[in-house]
């Protein structure tokens, strides 16, 4: 077995030799085999001439065993081994040669031998062997060079181990006494940033500064890129200002990196300032930099400034591309200037399909479906451009927006017939459209058609169906869709659970809704404020305030903030339970928590105070409401009028009625019916009739409740045949 292995060694050397001429070239070095020519001196060996040397090398490269190889040479030098290892030998062969030569008496491996062998090992990912060789080098007293470690770092990068470079750089200094320079730091930083180890890169940079190693322009560029990648743009900008302290001047690449990140984070003004600085520093931005700024301006509807930036592009010799025009057109469409976008479109020499799609989508978004179809027709007939899935999706969306889901479905079938495969979004629009129209069966058919087309429905599509089923109280079917989602490779999200929980609460299945909340948490889906508000409302409707409070506590514990809806539900529940003082305390807490109360919040509390007989407090609260900047509406006055009349203060109720008229708030049916009811109950039927006449003159239209109030007061209850009256009157 040993002889066979050795034969394979020599055979590998022979097979991988590129040519006999190269062999002869290395054979010419065999003069160093003699004692006088070798690096190591030592032993007497017969002098070998050119022809004999060639023969010796031929013997070496033949499939001899290792014993024959030993007999062919008196001694091999590190330089000869270095040249041998440079040949394309495999790792095992190279290691065996390395071990064999190292066993020669008086032989000592050189740095070059180690470097070429470590290079081969690194290319093959043999990093444990590399670590052993580095220790061996240290034990042999070989002086390390930085280039060796940089080479290993590159190999770690290629193997996908960027983090190992920091370990190696620490060992350079602490283990192998090789002090890293800016070269090593730059390589490590570059590898870390390309490997998305941005935080580690920042730490390495600060370590570099603490060791007084001067950073280069390349160093700053890489570290700024790392900061921008994790949205620490302020740190990157701080580095920009520190560059001059280290004798570095920012170049175009650094400015472009920062401008891109600022624009991406919607810090457009700073991006503009940096662009101006870039011009002053003599750096030339590229087209992408201009496009970044133009996009940022368009995001904030600063279209005129974006157009001026295009002019600056032209002055600088950059021709706006489809991306530039696309950003501008999209910005114009966003602010409703679709016709201006159309005018810009006709200035583009050869518009690509993305430009057409931008304009079509702009028309569709603003309800101009016919204009969108005209652009599509022009695109096909005049420019010969075939519509893509984005084009068709815009049309489908346009028909969906108009409620013409049937026509949208026809567009989908048409695109498929023309060889354009619909995507998930195409089908999801239709599913949502049919669900909104209450055509759930059609929506389900579209979902099945989508699956037949080889596409997996997404969470949005399933959510549309579940929500639609729940709204129609078809809970079992909604649950079935919910169970189908994992089988289709689709994970339910918070909206899925919220729809089901809301549906269960609507049919008073709160127990099952709570189970679903527990399942939701165990599945790793975080319940939000909407989830808890739905359940809290359900308990409060049933008068179970204690259970509602438990959920509020859980809500706070889980980190979901109480919003105005939560507070309103609780205040309303407390008022219904007659705990008005607690409701008012909760209202004050809402104010302390920074929630500005809306009219809804105020009206709930006013209504609660009035129903509890605390009319004066309600009137005072209405005045406080005005002082806080809220404007009382008709609901506010209706609650106060009802409260005053309930307290026997009908005159005050009528005064409040005149007040709301004076403030320009038109009374509604509830206002008239409330006053007429209390007037009739107090025996003031004639006044109620006068109030009705006054209301009719002002445009009030009585309803069944209005006539019922009057009839019950005029005609005795036992003699009133309501059915016959309504049949005769209506």
From Swiss-Prot:
Signal sequence, start to end: none
Transit peptide region: 1-18
Gene Ontology biological-process annotations: mitochondrial translation
SUPFAM superfamilies: HCP-like
UniProt subcellular location: Mitochondrion
Keywords carried by this UniProt record: Mitochondrion, Repeat, Transit peptide
PPR repeats (start-end): 110-144, 145-175, 181-215, 216-250, 251-285, 286-320, 321-351, 352-387, 388-422, 423-457, 458-492, 493-527, 528-562, 563-597, 598-632, 633-667, 668-702
Record-level GO cellular component terms: mitochondrion
NCBIfam families tied to this protein: PPR
Family: Belongs to the PPR family. P subfamily.
PANTHER family noted in UniProt: OS03G0856100 PROTEIN, TETRATRICOPEPTIDE-LIKE HELICAL DOMAIN SUPERFAMILY
Name the record gives this protein: Pentatricopeptide repeat-containing protein At5g64320, mitochondrial
């Amino acid at each position: 077995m040993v002889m066979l292995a050795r034969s394979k060694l020599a055979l590998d050397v022979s097979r991988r030799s590129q040519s006999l001429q190269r062999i002869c070239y290395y054979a010419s070095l065999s003069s160093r085999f003699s004692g006088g020519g070798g690096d190591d001196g030592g032993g007497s060996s017969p002098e070998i001439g050119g022809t004999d040397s060639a023969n010796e090398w031929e013997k070496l490269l033949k499939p001899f065993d290792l014993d024959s190889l030993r007999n062919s040479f008196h001694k091999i030098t590190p330089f000869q081994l270095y040249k041998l290892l440079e040949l394309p030998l495999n790792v095992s062969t190279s290691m065996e040669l390395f071990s064999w030569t190292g066993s020669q008496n008086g032989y000592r491996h050189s740095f070059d031998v180690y470097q070429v062998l470590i290079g081969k090992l690194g290319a093959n990912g043999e990093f444990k062997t590399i670590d052993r060789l580095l220790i061996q080098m240290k034990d042999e007293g070989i002086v390390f060079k930085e280039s060796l470690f940089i080479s290993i770092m590159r190999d770690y990068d290629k193997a996908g181990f960027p983090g190992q470079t920091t370990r190696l750089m620490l060992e350079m200094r602490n283990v192998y006494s090789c002090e890293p320079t800016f070269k090593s730091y730059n390589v490590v930083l570059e590898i870390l940033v390309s490997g998305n180890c941005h935080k580690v890169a920042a730490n390495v940079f600060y370590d570099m500064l603490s060791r007084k190693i001067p950073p280069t322009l390349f160093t700053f560029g890489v570290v700024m890129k790392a900061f921008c990648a994790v949205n620490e743009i302020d740190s990157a900008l701080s580095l920009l200002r520190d560059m001059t302290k280290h004798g570095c001047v920012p170049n175009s690449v650094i400015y472009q990196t920062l401008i891109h990140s600022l624009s991406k984070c919607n810090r457009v003004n700073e991006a503009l300032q940096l662009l101006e600085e870039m011009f002053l520093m003599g750096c030339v931005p590229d087209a992408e930099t201009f496009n970044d700024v133009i996009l940022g301006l368009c995001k904030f509807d600063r279209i005129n400034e974006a157009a001026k930036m295009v002019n600056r592009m032209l002055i600088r010799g950059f021709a706006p591309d489809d991306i530039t025009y696309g950003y501008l057109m999209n910005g114009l469409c966003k602010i409703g200037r679709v016709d201006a976008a159309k005018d810009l479109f006709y200035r583009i020499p050869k518009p690509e399909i993305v430009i057409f799609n931008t304009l079509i989508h702009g028309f569709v978004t603003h309800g101009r479906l016919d204009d969108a179809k005209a652009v599509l027709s022009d695109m096909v007939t005049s420019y010969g451009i075939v519509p893509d899935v984005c084009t068709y999706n815009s049309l489908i969306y346009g028909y969906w927006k108009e409620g013409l889901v049937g026509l949208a479905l026809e567009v989908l079938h048409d695109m498929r017939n023309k060889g354009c495969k619909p995507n998930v979004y195409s089908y999801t629009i239709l599913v949502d459209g049919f669900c909104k129209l209450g055509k759930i069966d059609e929506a389900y058919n579209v979902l099945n058609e989508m699956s037949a087309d080889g596409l997996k429905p997404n969470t949005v599509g399933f959510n549309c169906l579940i929500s639609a089923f729940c709204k129609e109280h078809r809970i079992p079917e909604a649950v079935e869709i919910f169970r189908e989602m994992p089988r289709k490779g689709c994970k339910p999200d918070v909206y899925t659970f919220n729809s089901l929980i809301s549906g269960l609460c609507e049919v008073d299945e709160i127990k099952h809704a709570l189970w679903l909340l527990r399942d939701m948490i165990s599945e790793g889906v975080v319940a939000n404020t909407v989830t808890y508000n739905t359940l809290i409302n359900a308990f409060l409707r049933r008068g179970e305030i204690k259970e509602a409070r438990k959920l509020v506590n859980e809500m706070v514990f889980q980190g979901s903030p109480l919003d105005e809806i939560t507070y309103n539900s609780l205040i309303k529940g407390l008022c219904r339970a007659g705990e008005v003082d607690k409701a008012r305390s909760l209202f004050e807490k809402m104010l302390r928590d920074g929630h500005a109360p809306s009219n809804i919040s105020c009206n709930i509390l006013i209504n609660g105070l009035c129903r509890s007989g605390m009319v004066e407090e309600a009137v005072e609260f209405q005045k406080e409401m005005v002082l806080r900047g809220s404007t009382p509406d008709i609901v506010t006055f209706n609650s106060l009028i009802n409260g005053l009349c309930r307290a026997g203060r009908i005159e005050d109720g009528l005064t409040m009625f005149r007040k709301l008229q004076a403030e320009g708030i038109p009374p509604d049916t509830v206002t008239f019916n409330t006053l007429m009811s209390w007037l009739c109950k107090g025996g003031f039927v004639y006044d109620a009739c006068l109030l009705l006449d006054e209301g009719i003159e002002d445009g009030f239209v009585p309803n069944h409740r209005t006539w019922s109030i009057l009839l019950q007061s005029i005609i005795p209850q036992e003699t009133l045949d309501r059915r016959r009256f309504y049949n005769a009157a209506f």
